[in-house]
């Protein structure tokens, strides 16, 4: 296995993924040679290539150069992949993405952010306040952070901030100094089987905290709050209600931002002003404040960093805004996330919110279609596409019509089932009007609809403005 200090040559199979590309960027900063393959070119592969990585856009055993010392694979890569087969024939170590993250993370003072929702934004905010505070952390984030112009930050300080992935249990390989948990919900049931097992995994995650470390827990979530008594380490709580250690009061949301007064126990720390919408983002920022404050960063420094934050890619990302009509894309793919995103959309002053939802995975749809049916109350129009399988085989009787039926059953009048992205884009081109906020939702490729509509609006110049 290549040495962390002296570098080596690591090859990534599936390097274009958000998690894989972030690790590749960290290794490049540490002096590694990096190569990788991914059939699809994207912003991450282009950025890595510009930074010195060798990128192949097909899977081939020939991509495995003689000098490669280690091969990293994503969860989507099968054992039959020709590069994996070639690596095993050469007796090269083949490690999972989570294993490499754990190796990098456990070699530094680790800050891990876990939870069903909000962990990408919260981990980005933690990294930003630490950077502003002069701690120069490395950061591995599950989305594009505009302030880093990347999904990773190659800081050379003692800390590494990581978004901890609970979906397959790999977050249990991490041994954090600080573990921040945003919330716990019934998701990834294809791996865990039950909510009780998910809660048990988070208890195990807290047990992984290093001696002298801390658990920072969101008191807004009852399941997370239930972990307080289970922690063998010091517990710090944060929330908007009750008496947590860190509290945001007087929350006011307006337009594309919000503000709140921040307290640490009985001490007033100051005013927080955010330039991203949604009460959930005040809560995400509060978690980052708790982490930064525990590390000794002054509140004024953190407030400055948080006030400059413009969001993470695919988290209420504005694709078009000409002053009246907006096209926004969001990764939300769970009922709780959809409700929070629609609540944020409702505050920006649109005449009509048009939600386009692409369900993600048959298993998630099977377990949560009733909850999805109740999640769209703040949308004026709802369009549901076919399920994005994410590698899953279809389940008998599980389809998008289950969701549209539930939405209609909740009393919603304008609900449309449009199977394909192409049909959806054609529909929106005809029906989009000034004052609309069109919101694409899902973890698959529904963003293509938003991007296509933004390009159409720009090309047609229906209203003045330039697409973003």
Curated annotation (Swiss-Prot):
Pathway in which the depicted protein is active: Cell wall biogenesis; peptidoglycan biosynthesis
Keyword Repeat: no
Record's GO cellular component terms: cytoplasm
Keyword Amino-acid biosynthesis (UniProt): no
Gene3D superfamilies, alphabetized: Mur ligase, C-terminal domain, Mur-like, catalytic domain, NAD(P)-binding Rossmann-like Domain
Family membership noted in the UniProt record: Belongs to the MurCDEF family.
Binding site for ATP: 115-121
Compartments where found: Cytoplasm
GO MF annotation: an example: ATP binding
Gene: murC
Organism of derivation: Moorella thermoacetica (strain ATCC 39073 / JCM 9320)
UniProt GO BP: cell division; cell wall organization; peptidoglycan biosynthetic process; regulation of cell shape
Its job: Cell wall formation.
InterPro entries noted in UniProt: Mur-like_cat_sf, Mur_ligase_C, Mur_ligase_C_dom_sf, Mur_ligase_cen, Mur_ligase_N, MurCDEF_pg_biosynth, UDP-N-AcMur_Ala_ligase_MurC
Record field: catalytic activity: UDP-N-acetyl-alpha-D-muramate + L-alanine + ATP = UDP-N-acetyl-alpha-D-muramoyl-L-alanine + ADP + phosphate + H(+)
EC number: 6.3.2.8
Pfam families registered for this protein in UniProt: Mur_ligase, Mur_ligase_C, Mur_ligase_M
Keywords assigned by UniProt, alphabetized: ATP-binding, Cell cycle, Cell division, Cell shape, Cell wall biogenesis/degradation, Cytoplasm, Ligase, Nucleotide-binding, Peptidoglycan synthesis
Protein name: UDP-N-acetylmuramate--L-alanine ligase
